[in-house]
Protein backbone atom coordinates (compact mmCIF):
# COMPACT_ATOMS: atom_id res chain seq x y z
CA UNK A 1 0.00 0.00 0.00
CA UNK A 2 1.29 3.46 -0.87
CA UNK A 3 1.98 5.83 2.01
CA UNK A 4 -0.16 8.74 0.79
CA UNK A 5 -3.25 6.60 0.25
CA UNK A 6 -2.77 4.95 3.65
CA UNK A 7 -2.55 8.33 5.36
CA UNK A 8 -5.50 9.78 3.46
CA UNK A 9 -7.69 6.88 4.51
CA UNK A 10 -6.78 7.55 8.14
CA UNK A 11 -7.95 11.20 7.98
CA UNK A 12 -4.78 12.73 9.43
CA UNK A 13 -1.20 12.91 8.32
CA UNK A 14 1.23 10.71 10.21
CA UNK A 15 3.84 12.20 12.42
CA UNK A 16 5.89 10.77 15.25
CA UNK A 17 7.29 12.23 18.27
CA UNK A 18 10.01 12.99 20.63
CA UNK A 19 12.29 15.63 22.00
CA UNK A 20 15.60 16.44 20.42
CA UNK A 21 19.11 16.93 21.61
CA UNK A 22 21.23 19.64 20.10
CA UNK A 23 23.71 19.12 17.27
CA UNK A 24 27.17 20.63 17.58
CA UNK A 25 29.42 21.76 14.72
CA UNK A 26 33.15 21.26 15.35
CA UNK A 27 34.23 23.14 12.22
CA UNK A 28 34.27 20.01 10.10
CA UNK A 29 31.20 17.95 10.97
CA UNK A 30 28.23 17.62 13.32
CA UNK A 31 29.47 15.74 16.36
CA UNK A 32 28.88 15.21 20.06
CA UNK A 33 27.21 12.93 22.54
CA UNK A 34 23.89 14.73 22.62
CA UNK A 35 20.76 12.55 22.59
CA UNK A 36 19.85 11.09 19.22
CA UNK A 37 17.09 13.15 17.63
CA UNK A 38 13.66 11.73 16.91
CA UNK A 39 11.79 11.62 13.62
CA UNK A 40 8.33 10.85 12.29
CA UNK A 41 6.86 7.48 13.23
CA UNK A 42 4.84 7.17 10.04
CA UNK A 43 1.73 5.06 9.47
CA UNK A 44 3.48 1.73 8.97
CA UNK A 45 4.61 0.76 12.50
CA UNK A 46 3.52 -2.75 13.51
CA UNK A 47 4.25 -3.86 17.09
CA UNK A 48 5.29 -7.44 17.69
CA UNK A 49 7.89 -7.86 14.96
CA UNK A 50 9.73 -11.20 15.36
CA UNK A 51 13.07 -11.42 17.11
CA UNK A 52 15.63 -12.00 14.37
CA UNK A 53 18.68 -10.31 12.88
CA UNK A 54 18.46 -11.61 9.29
CA UNK A 55 15.62 -9.97 7.37
CA UNK A 56 16.76 -10.81 3.83
CA UNK A 57 14.05 -12.42 1.70
CA UNK A 58 14.83 -15.26 -0.74
CA UNK A 59 15.23 -14.00 -4.29
CA UNK A 60 15.43 -10.35 -3.34
CA UNK A 61 16.87 -7.94 -5.90
CA UNK A 62 17.81 -5.47 -3.18
CA UNK A 63 21.37 -4.67 -2.12
CA UNK A 64 22.41 -6.54 1.02
CA UNK A 65 22.92 -4.16 3.95
CA UNK A 66 24.54 -4.74 7.33
CA UNK A 67 22.97 -2.20 9.69
CA UNK A 68 24.59 -2.01 13.12
CA UNK A 69 25.55 0.22 15.99
CA UNK A 70 25.64 0.69 19.75
CA UNK A 71 22.89 1.95 22.05
CA UNK A 72 24.45 4.22 24.66
CA UNK A 73 23.28 5.78 27.90
CA UNK A 74 22.75 9.51 28.33
CA UNK A 75 26.48 10.01 29.00
CA UNK A 76 27.22 8.95 25.43
CA UNK A 77 29.65 6.22 26.49
CA UNK A 78 27.96 3.60 28.70
CA UNK A 79 26.47 0.70 26.67
CA UNK A 80 22.79 -0.05 27.27
CA UNK A 81 22.23 -3.77 27.83
CA UNK A 82 18.94 -5.42 26.83
CA UNK A 83 17.55 -2.41 24.99
CA UNK A 84 14.82 -3.46 22.57
CA UNK A 85 15.68 -2.33 19.04
CA UNK A 86 12.92 -2.52 16.44
CA UNK A 87 13.45 -1.69 12.77
CA UNK A 88 11.14 -1.59 9.77
CA UNK A 89 11.48 -0.40 6.17
CA UNK A 90 10.10 -0.87 2.67
CA UNK A 91 11.18 -3.56 0.22
CA UNK A 92 13.14 -3.06 -3.00
CA UNK A 93 9.94 -1.86 -4.71
CA UNK A 94 9.19 0.81 -2.11
CA UNK A 95 6.34 -1.13 -0.48
CA UNK A 96 5.84 -1.92 3.23
CA UNK A 97 4.48 -5.24 4.46
CA UNK A 98 1.52 -4.08 6.54
CA UNK A 99 -0.50 -7.27 6.81
CA UNK A 100 1.41 -10.55 6.48
CA UNK A 101 2.27 -12.85 9.37
CA UNK A 102 5.88 -12.88 8.12
CA UNK A 103 6.50 -9.21 9.07
CA UNK A 104 8.70 -8.80 5.97
CA UNK A 105 11.52 -6.28 6.54
CA UNK A 106 10.50 -5.87 10.17
CA UNK A 107 12.50 -7.20 13.11
CA UNK A 108 13.26 -6.89 16.81
CA UNK A 109 16.47 -7.57 18.72
CA UNK A 110 17.87 -6.96 22.20
CA UNK A 111 21.27 -5.40 22.66
CA UNK A 112 23.97 -7.42 24.39
CA UNK A 113 26.09 -6.39 27.36
CA UNK A 114 28.12 -4.27 24.93
CA UNK A 115 25.00 -2.36 23.83
CA UNK A 116 25.44 -3.48 20.24
CA UNK A 117 22.82 -4.40 17.66
CA UNK A 118 23.22 -5.80 14.15
CA UNK A 119 20.71 -6.55 11.38
CA UNK A 120 21.30 -8.05 7.96
CA UNK A 121 18.69 -6.69 5.57
CA UNK A 122 18.52 -4.85 2.24
CA UNK A 123 19.01 -1.18 1.48
CA UNK A 124 15.54 0.40 1.24
CA UNK A 125 14.70 2.63 -1.71
CA UNK A 126 12.95 5.98 -2.10
CA UNK A 127 9.22 5.77 -2.79
CA UNK A 128 6.40 8.01 -3.93
CA UNK A 129 4.35 9.50 -1.09
CA UNK A 130 1.98 11.50 -3.26
CA UNK A 131 1.74 13.13 -6.66
CA UNK A 132 4.76 15.35 -6.12
CA UNK A 133 6.47 14.03 -2.98
CA UNK A 134 9.09 11.28 -2.86
CA UNK A 135 10.39 10.09 0.49
CA UNK A 136 14.14 9.38 0.55
CA UNK A 137 15.32 5.88 1.42
CA UNK A 138 15.16 5.36 5.19
CA UNK A 139 14.99 2.86 8.02
CA UNK A 140 12.59 3.36 10.92
CA UNK A 141 13.74 2.55 14.46
CA UNK A 142 12.21 2.33 17.91
CA UNK A 143 14.40 1.88 21.00
CA UNK A 144 12.66 0.94 24.26
CA UNK A 145 12.85 -1.27 27.33
CA UNK A 146 15.47 0.76 29.21
CA UNK A 147 15.32 3.09 32.21
CA UNK A 148 15.83 5.99 29.82
CA UNK A 149 13.48 7.72 27.39
CA UNK A 150 12.11 5.57 24.56
CA UNK A 151 13.18 6.76 21.12
CA UNK A 152 11.46 6.74 17.73
CA UNK A 153 13.68 7.83 14.85
CA UNK A 154 14.77 7.24 11.25
CA UNK A 155 18.09 7.07 9.43
CA UNK A 156 18.77 8.29 5.90
CA UNK A 157 21.66 7.78 3.49
CA UNK A 158 24.10 10.27 2.01
CA UNK A 159 23.80 10.89 -1.70
CA UNK A 160 20.02 10.45 -1.80
CA UNK A 161 18.73 13.26 -4.02
CA UNK A 162 15.34 13.25 -2.30
CA UNK A 163 16.66 14.27 1.13
CA UNK A 164 16.40 17.99 0.38
CA UNK A 165 12.77 17.61 -0.75
CA UNK A 166 11.51 15.80 2.34
CA UNK A 167 10.22 17.74 5.36
CA UNK A 168 11.74 15.30 7.84
CA UNK A 169 15.13 14.47 6.33
CA UNK A 170 15.81 18.10 5.35
CA UNK A 171 15.25 19.32 8.92
CA UNK A 172 18.58 20.48 10.46
CA UNK A 173 17.97 18.16 13.42
CA UNK A 174 18.17 15.17 11.07
CA UNK A 175 21.72 15.97 9.90
CA UNK A 176 23.46 13.49 12.18
CA UNK A 177 21.12 10.75 10.99
CA UNK A 178 22.11 11.02 7.32
CA UNK A 179 24.67 8.25 7.14
CA UNK A 180 27.55 7.09 4.97
CA UNK A 181 27.22 3.76 3.18
CA UNK A 182 30.38 1.67 3.23
CA UNK A 183 31.21 -1.83 2.01
CA UNK A 184 32.64 -4.94 3.67
CA UNK A 185 35.04 -7.54 2.27
CA UNK A 186 32.13 -9.29 0.55
CA UNK A 187 31.18 -6.10 -1.28
CA UNK A 188 28.00 -5.84 0.81
CA UNK A 189 26.81 -2.46 2.01
CA UNK A 190 27.50 -1.43 5.60
CA UNK A 191 25.89 1.34 7.66
CA UNK A 192 26.70 2.07 11.30
CA UNK A 193 24.53 4.15 13.60
CA UNK A 194 25.23 4.70 17.31
CA UNK A 195 22.34 5.88 19.45
CA UNK A 196 22.47 8.05 22.58
CA UNK A 197 19.40 7.95 24.80
CA UNK A 198 18.29 10.63 27.25
CA UNK A 199 16.75 10.98 30.69
CA UNK A 200 13.23 9.62 31.01
CA UNK A 201 10.45 12.12 31.74
CA UNK A 202 7.01 10.56 32.12
CA UNK A 203 3.53 11.40 33.29
CA UNK A 204 2.59 9.57 36.51
CA UNK A 205 0.46 6.45 36.18
CA UNK A 206 -2.69 7.94 37.71
CA UNK A 207 -2.70 10.90 35.35
CA UNK A 208 -1.96 8.62 32.39
CA UNK A 209 -5.15 6.67 33.15
CA UNK A 210 -7.16 9.90 33.17
CA UNK A 211 -6.08 10.97 29.68
CA UNK A 212 -6.05 7.61 27.88
CA UNK A 213 -9.15 6.52 26.01
CA UNK A 214 -11.10 7.13 22.83
CA UNK A 215 -11.70 10.71 21.66
CA UNK A 216 -14.06 11.99 19.00
CA UNK A 217 -12.28 14.77 17.12
CA UNK A 218 -13.71 17.91 15.54
CA UNK A 219 -13.21 16.43 12.04
CA UNK A 220 -15.33 13.40 13.11
CA UNK A 221 -12.31 11.09 13.20
CA UNK A 222 -11.61 8.87 16.22
CA UNK A 223 -8.33 9.15 18.13
CA UNK A 224 -7.43 6.36 20.52
CA UNK A 225 -4.75 7.47 23.03
CA UNK A 226 -2.94 4.76 25.00
CA UNK A 227 0.29 4.19 26.91
CA UNK A 228 3.09 2.05 25.44
CA UNK A 229 6.40 2.03 27.29
CA UNK A 230 6.96 5.56 28.52
CA UNK A 231 5.26 7.16 25.52
CA UNK A 232 1.72 8.10 24.61
CA UNK A 233 0.66 6.40 21.38
CA UNK A 234 -2.36 7.30 19.30
CA UNK A 235 -4.40 5.32 16.81
CA UNK A 236 -6.29 7.35 14.24
CA UNK A 237 -9.37 5.49 13.02
CA UNK A 238 -7.76 2.28 14.22
CA UNK A 239 -4.26 2.74 12.78
CA UNK A 240 -1.16 3.41 14.91
CA UNK A 241 0.15 6.78 13.78
CA UNK A 242 2.10 8.55 16.52
CA UNK A 243 4.16 8.00 19.68
CA UNK A 244 4.65 11.02 21.89
CA UNK A 245 6.91 12.10 24.74
CA UNK A 246 5.68 13.90 27.83
CA UNK A 247 6.57 17.59 28.12
CA UNK A 248 4.83 18.52 31.39
CA UNK A 249 1.46 20.02 32.33
CA UNK A 250 -0.50 17.25 30.54
CA UNK A 251 1.18 18.09 27.24
CA UNK A 252 2.89 15.69 24.82
CA UNK A 253 5.00 16.81 21.91
CA UNK A 254 6.25 15.35 18.66
CA UNK A 255 9.61 15.20 17.02
CA UNK A 256 10.88 17.75 14.52
CA UNK A 257 8.33 20.17 15.94
CA UNK A 258 5.44 18.79 13.90
CA UNK A 259 2.88 17.92 16.57
CA UNK A 260 1.70 18.83 20.06
CA UNK A 261 -1.12 17.35 22.10
CA UNK A 262 -2.59 19.17 25.12
CA UNK A 263 -5.06 17.46 27.46
CA UNK A 264 -7.56 19.17 29.77
CA UNK A 265 -8.89 17.11 32.69
CA UNK A 266 -12.49 17.90 33.61
CA UNK A 267 -14.09 17.92 37.06
CA UNK A 268 -16.60 15.24 36.02
CA UNK A 269 -13.79 12.78 35.22
CA UNK A 270 -13.84 13.43 31.50
CA UNK A 271 -11.11 14.93 29.35
CA UNK A 272 -10.60 17.11 26.30
CA UNK A 273 -7.69 17.19 23.88
CA UNK A 274 -6.27 19.77 21.48
CA UNK A 275 -4.00 18.49 18.71
CA UNK A 276 -1.87 20.77 16.52
CA UNK A 277 0.32 19.43 13.73
CA UNK A 278 2.09 20.53 10.55
CA UNK A 279 0.85 18.89 7.36
CA UNK A 280 2.79 18.06 4.19
CA UNK A 281 2.09 21.57 2.87
CA UNK A 282 3.79 22.88 6.03
CA UNK A 283 0.56 24.41 7.29
CA UNK A 284 -0.56 24.12 10.90
CA UNK A 285 -3.77 22.17 11.46
CA UNK A 286 -5.59 22.21 14.80
CA UNK A 287 -8.21 19.72 15.98
CA UNK A 288 -10.08 19.41 19.26
CA UNK A 289 -11.67 16.33 20.75
CA UNK A 290 -13.72 15.00 23.65
CA UNK A 291 -13.17 11.72 25.46
CA UNK A 292 -16.06 9.37 24.75
CA UNK A 293 -14.74 6.07 26.10
CA UNK A 294 -12.65 5.37 29.19
CA UNK A 295 -10.64 2.15 29.41
CA UNK A 296 -10.63 -0.08 32.52
CA UNK A 297 -7.86 0.69 35.03
Regions inferred by a protein language model and the residue ranges of each:
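Hydrophobic residues positioned within well-ordered beta-strands of beta-sheet architectures
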Residues: 67, 139, 153, 177, ...
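Beta-strand-dominated extracellular/periplasmic modules and repeats
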Residues: 27-169
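N-terminal secretory signal peptides and thylakoid transit peptides that target proteins
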Residues: 1-17
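Well-ordered beta-strand positions in beta-sheet-rich domains
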Residues: 84, 106-108, 116-118, 152-154, ...
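Residue-level recognition of well-ordered beta-strand positions that form the cores
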Residues: 70, 86, 142, 194-196, ...
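Extracellular beta-sheet/turn segments enriched in Thr/Pro/Gly and aliphatic residues
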Residues: 53-58, 162-202, 259
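C-terminal segment of classical bacterial N-terminal signal peptides
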Residues: 20-24
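Peripheral terminal and inter-domain segments
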Residues: 196-297
Amino acid sequence: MKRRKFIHNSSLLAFSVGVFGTIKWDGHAYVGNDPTTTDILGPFYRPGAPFRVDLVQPGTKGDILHFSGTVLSKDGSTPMKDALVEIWHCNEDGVYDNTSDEYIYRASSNTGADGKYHFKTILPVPYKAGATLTRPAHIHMRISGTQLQDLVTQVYFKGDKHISEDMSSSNPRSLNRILDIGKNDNNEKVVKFDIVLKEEYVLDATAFKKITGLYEMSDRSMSDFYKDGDELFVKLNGQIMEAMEYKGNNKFEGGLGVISVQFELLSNGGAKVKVSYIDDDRKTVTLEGNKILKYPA
